[in-house]
Amino acid sequence: MASTASTGIIDTPSSHSVEDTVEKLKAILQAKGVKLFTLIDHSGEAEKTGLAMRPTKLLIFGNPKAGTPVMLASPRSAIDLPLKLLIWEDAQAKVWISYNSLSYLGERHGLSQQLLSNLAVVETLAAQAGV
């Protein structure tokens, strides 16, 4: 699976389970001093209602020092911030880390390269967590 230009979503493979990928991401976030605002367990919530869903978790994270200038320049960018990483398992039991591409966020909100660099941590996190 690769980046889909029409959706702006980048899919990066992980060589770990969903749970291990999430734990790895949490450790990396903590080491980098990036705040984890929340972790949403979509599959866990589905199970509570009697529905089956492959493992799917969403991390919402950020650094107000990096995100605030972006939102000041483009208030509507707050709909995409804090940053998000979706960790999910496909039908073949392959695990993926998905996130909005920086180019998509830049085009969507008219952000300069300088402001986009504030959000580049999302790419680093996905790369580090998948290996």
What name fits each language-model region?
Residues 23-24, 41, 73, 121:
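Short Gly/charged-rich anion-binding patches and loops
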Residues 2-33:
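Terminal, regulation- and interaction-focused segments at domain boundaries
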Residues 107-131:
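Well-ordered alpha/beta subsegment
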Residues 11-12, 59-62, 87:
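Short beta-strand element of the conserved SAM-dependent methyltransferase core
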Residues 84-109:
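Beta-strand/loop substructures that line and gate deep hydrophobic ligand-binding cavities in soluble
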Residues 37-83:
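Compact, glycine-rich, soluble single-domain proteins
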